[in-house]
Amino acid sequence: MVTINTALCKNSTRVMILGSGELGKEIAIECQRLGIEVISVDSYSNAPAMHVSHRHHVIDMLNPKEIKRCINLEHPDFIVPEIEAISTNALIELEKNGYNIVPSAKTIHITMNRKLIRVLVSKKLNILTSEYQFASSFDELKIKTKVIGYPCLIKPIMSSSGKGQSVIYNEKELRHSWEKSQTYGRTSLGEVIIEKIIPFDFEITLLVVNSVDGMHFCLPIGHRQEKGDYQESWQPHKMDNVIFEKAKKISKKIVSYLGGYGIFGVEFFIYKDKVIFSEISPRPHDTGMVTLISQNLSEFALHVRSFLKLPIGKIRQYGPSSSVVICGNELYGNKISFSNIECINTNQQIRIFSKPNIKGYRRLGVILDQDETIERSLRKAKKTASKILIKT
């Protein structure tokens, strides 16, 4: 029997969210709907999830001492990482001391490190990936890129949202790419992964829910990125059912090995009849924002239900839906305002993230849309997003 103790009472059920961005905000809202006490944590003040939490803390998320101090102060029942920039060694130690890490400290540790997850998937689980090499110095990078060939993609082994990544076409670009990876990676580990750029027809995110009543799959989500950063997504993505079943089978194999209750976002490249593994996130995925309008249970509701050990049942998808980001570009300041919001059409919704400032470019919200076809839905959502006026 699952018991939830009311927030702010002496015996309250507490969830601590490590990372308080727009994804953490939606997780916090789902917890609030269930009367759970929410504590959000991030490295900066006034992060989105902090607006809808009972309490918050601002700490260095990569400092294991600060992570442990914060958690031992609050004694949460569930610790829910929402970002990559976290001391995973601290989480492993905390789990050994009895804390419940979602989905598990081992899973967080493996999936936040591109080297660990790529070797696991390709070598241990024998799943198809793009060709890759690793390098921990500039001299080694020069050698390994010759093995992979040009063009290739260079990424820090720990980063997200395209940070520190670059596509290089010749040896002259190596120095800049290496320096970028060292500057913008999430930690100072220094190591990078070099990936062969492969042809593909499209890429998808497959949301997989591991729960007490089995493993559940959302319909495939298509998405478009720029410089590794999500711009728009849609559900369902049209694809051959045989290929979809193959993606589900691969996802199940990976998630079953990793273990733990929660939602996983598995990214694939699809080329002809090949399903090629790209990455996996053990938490709600930014491309999954579309599920706020496309499903009876969003990815955030699914995540919370699963780690609380509540049954998921049947996930219903409502038809062609899309999500398009509202971006601030070449803007600076901490007084962000949005106008012309009344341009939103029927069957559309808006989410404004409430990020406290902007320094050049930043995702600040999304337009959610439903229509008879994906093409119509995307077209409408992009048109509406372009009409939202942002000032600082």
Curated annotation (Swiss-Prot):
Ligase is among the record's keywords: yes
Family matches, as Pfam families: ATP-grasp, PurT_C, RS_preATP-grasp-like
Annotated positions binding N(1)-(5-phospho-beta-D-ribosyl)glycinamide: E22, L23, E82, D286, K355, R362, R363
Pathway entry: Purine metabolism; IMP biosynthesis via de novo pathway; N(2)-formyl-N(1)-(5-phospho-D-ribosyl)glycinamide from N(1)-(5-phospho-D-ribosyl)glycinamide (formate route): step 1/1
Residues involved in ATP binding: R114, K155, S160, S161, G162, K163, G164, Q165, E195, K196, I197, I198, E203
Boundaries of every ATP-grasp domain copy: 119-308
Function of the protein: Involved in the de novo purine biosynthesis. Catalyzes the transfer of formate to 5-phospho-ribosyl-glycinamide (GAR), producing 5-phospho-ribosyl-N-formylglycinamide (FGAR). Formate is provided by PurU via hydrolysis of 10-formyl-tetrahydrofolate.
Family stated for the protein in its record: Belongs to the PurK/PurT family.
Designated name of the protein: Formate-dependent phosphoribosylglycinamide formyltransferase
Organism taxonomic ancestry: Bacteria, Pseudomonadati, Pseudomonadota, Gammaproteobacteria, Enterobacterales
